[in-house]
Amino acid sequence: MVEQIMIQGTASDAGKSVIVAGLCRLFKNKGKRVVPFKSQNMSLNSFITATGDEMGRAQVFQAEAAGVFPDVRMNPVLLKPTNDRQSQVIFMGAILDNMDAVSYHDFKQTLIPKIQAVYQSLADENDIIVLEGAGSPAEINLNDRDIVNMGMAKMVDAPVVLVADIDKGGVFASIYGTIMLLKEEERARLKGVIINKFRGDVALLQPGIEMIEELTNVPVIGVIPYANLQLEEEDSVSLSGKNYVLDSSALLDIAIICLPRISNFTDFHILEIQPDISVRYIRNLADFGNPDLVIIPGSKNTLEDMAFLEQSGLKKAIQNYAENAGKVIGICGGYQMLGKRMLDPNQVESEKVEIAGLGLLDTETIFLDQKRTTQITGVTFSSEPVEGYEIHMGQTKRGENTQPFCKIKAVNGNQETHEDGAISANKNIIGTYIHGIFDNDIFLGNLFNELLTQKNKSIYPHEIIKLKEHKETEYDKLAALLEANIQMDQLEKIMKGEKICVSTQKPAIKE
């Protein structure tokens, strides 16, 4: 019979996703068949599986930690906000519809038996499932139809551990408030608490731990120190912690336009971990500066984000930068914005039906009802092998003054040839639909060398950090961190359904 544990949090960005990933790697290293599971994820960071299914990147990250291929069953429901009131609802990798919050709140009850069936199929194939909740289980206005926190735990009779972020302050209030807002039967399901992102001497924390255990009768089974691990951040809340300041000592200054509806910002994690590279996120004109490369990322609402560039003055700044031989790369929605205009006659993305683009590429995009979701492999115009994935509802047509960026050779593992993207005549403007393009180390190394040559500097002096190898190292560090700072004997008892009691044992931080 499968063992299971559910990690819930006192709030978004408490560290649920990372702890789930760490536990997946920890159990994998013990020889267990383990998979992650999150019934419903709301995110604009998504991934395309080998079968062409769309799922949240957090569960991809966790699957990698577990040593298994991403499987859409690990995240059956994905909500991708299109605006402040509506989301695209994706079930088992395919679009169902666009819904507002009220409509979805009513609709999601119909998904319960399907979610249960999906979960059971994973349970039949594995030794352990590590579940993740969303936000907080104490969203009392939504709990009557919850399918992702205590509602999910009840569906599969999973014990729950609550994670609280001490780094933001107010950790004991957040623990106590969350537990007190739970129903009695939900509190009975809560078996332990983990305090996350702790800095300092744990002895100073001990009186608070003892008091919160006495108040709640729930044991604190771990205190995780703040660790500067280089892991992907999937939650949009983490964008607030991104760098916005130039590191003047770096060899290259890469500026990413932080669009209001930015999607797949995980594309840029690989840039952030390279030595001597400054990556900063630009929200306004004052921060533009004089970068060596400007990247326009993907967007869930490309027309509205194009309007943002116009209103903020960034459109003109990017155009002036390009006219002065600046290098600009657009990914997915960013590629569409580089063109002359975008058409949305069926209002697939927004209420706008047409908007002018940046005019830096001789291209035009029309939005269609059908979404393209594929994994691809191909070769760039410079003969660099690349792989990645596409997620878009736009179809872009190139004009005479551009050439393709890439020749696609395989789609979802099947041989298929077509052209992707566009490059300007002077080669300074590049647009592509390929997410994960910078994860290709040959392409990235050549890009760095090109940018340094333009500055009359020698080639990039460091070996490009390869993402897959880097991730494996970080997953092992994360697993070791959790094993050293969680009472694993207590956690394993919880997973086996055994009762544990509040302990007087003092936790000791181990870096």
From Swiss-Prot:
Residues 251-443 form the GATase cobBQ-type domain. GO terms for molecular function: ABC-type vitamin B12 transporter activity; catalytic activity. Pathway: Cofactor biosynthesis; adenosylcobalamin biosynthesis. Keywords: Cobalamin biosynthesis, Glutamine amidotransferase. Pfam families: CbiA, GATase_3. One of its GO terms (biological process) is cobalamin biosynthetic process. The active site is at residues 332, 435. Catalyzes amidations at positions B, D, E, and G on adenosylcobyrinic A,C-diamide. NH(2) groups are provided by glutamine, and one molecule of ATP is hydrogenolyzed for each amidation. NCBIfam families: cobQ (TIGR00313), PRK00784.1 (NF001989). Belongs to the CobB/CobQ family. CobQ subfamily. This is Cobyric acid synthase. The gene is cobQ.
